A protein has these predicted regions:
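Conserved hydrophobic/aromatic beta-strand scaffold that supports enzyme active sites
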Residues: 34-38, 92-94, 113, 162-166, ...
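Extended, compositionally biased flexible segments
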Residues: 26, 33-104
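A short glycine-rich, His/Asp/Glu-containing loop-to-beta-strand
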Residues: 12-46, 53, 143-194
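Short, structured patches in soluble enzyme cores that scaffold and shape functional sites
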Residues: 97, 105, 113-117, 150, ...
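Glycine- and acidic-residue-biased ligand/ion/polar-headgroup-sensing regions
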Residues: 50-77, 95, 169, 181-229, ...
């Protein structure tokens, strides 16, 4: 698959009320989903979780999340949110499969819904911002900040893995190139991945590379801007490159068929000398 199939520019998947609407059918895979809903002041949006678990993550602004399940009834979480994805870490809400959800925002805002098809029905929960592990990964021009709000070892989900990355302007991240497209116990996980991008400042841009790990595999070299997404069904991915003077944000959403929810990656053999700066 090529850049045309896997690079989704801003608006390419818009499906009111969603500015971004990427599900398994649109992506051509089985597990991972991402939606971004934009609410006007006083606006609200209702949806049903179906056979997926979801995390409601404020990108800009705060909201109230009401969650109703047949087994536990209704609960409500107040998400303080944030001014922008570049400002700080946000709190979030976990939505179990089969739930009914209402998101409402007095001041308006933008909210990501990261999802994964799943089997277990876990309880609805609130994720406080102070409890999100923040990792300073890499060094020099490969330094970046990783917000592990729903990584495999920081927050319990059935299948969903999601993190945020801030790459300073002029730096590389998602580097060295790595992959997670095979099930090799103890060495590599099989995970579909969505990159959703925002760039700080007007006219900012970045670049994303994905190249094949097998014949006919994913092959992308894309200029990305705010609101763009890149799909990684397979293949080596990285680097993600931020334009000098413009910090780059991306939200990674991952899920796969493995019985164990884990993030295990394999580095490209041509770049093994740089893996020490990755984690």
């Amino acid at each position: 698959m090529t850049s045309t199939d896997l690079h989704l520019p801003r608006g390419a998947t818009a499906n009111a009320p969603y500015a971004v609407d990427i599900g398994p059918e649109r992506a051509g895979w089985t597990h991972s989903s991402l939606r971004v809903v934009e609410l006007a002041p006083g606006g609200s949006h209702a949806f049903t979780a179906g056979d997926s678990e979801w995390i409601v993550l404020p990108l800009e602004g705060g909201c109230t999340v009401q969650i109703e399940t047949a087994s536990t009834g209704q609960c409500e979480f107040q998400l303080l949110g944030r001014e922008s994805v570049f400002a700080n870490v946000s709190d979030f809400a976990y939505v179990p499969r089969d739930a009914r959800v209402l998101i409402a925002s007095g001041a308006g805002g933008r909210f990501a819904l990261a999802g994964a098809k799943c089997e277990r029905r876990l309880p609805a929960r609130y994720g406080p911002a102070p409890e999100v592990p923040v990792e300073e990964r890499g060094s020099g021009t490969c330094a970046r900040r990783v917000r592990n709000f729903a990584s495999a070892d920081s927050f319990d989900c059935d299948k969903l893995i999601a993190v945020e990355v801030i790459t300073p302007g002029g730096n590389w991240s998602s580097y060295p190139p790595h992959k997670h497209d095979e099930h090799r116990p103890g060495e590599e996980s099989e995970l579909e991945e969505i990159y959703y991008f925002e760039i700080d400042g007007p006219n900012g841009l970045g670049y994303q590379r994905v190249f094949p790990s097998r014949e006919g595999g994913a092959d992308v070299l894309a200029e990305v801007r705010s609101g763009d997404a890149v799909l990684v069904p397979d293949g080596w991915h990285g680097p993600s490159i931020a334009q000098p003077g413009h910090d780059m944000y991306y939200l990674n959403v991952m899920a796969g068929p493995g019985r164990t929810r884990e993030w295990r990656i394999c580095f490209h053999p041509d770049h093994t000398d740089t893996t020490g700066g990755y984690r």
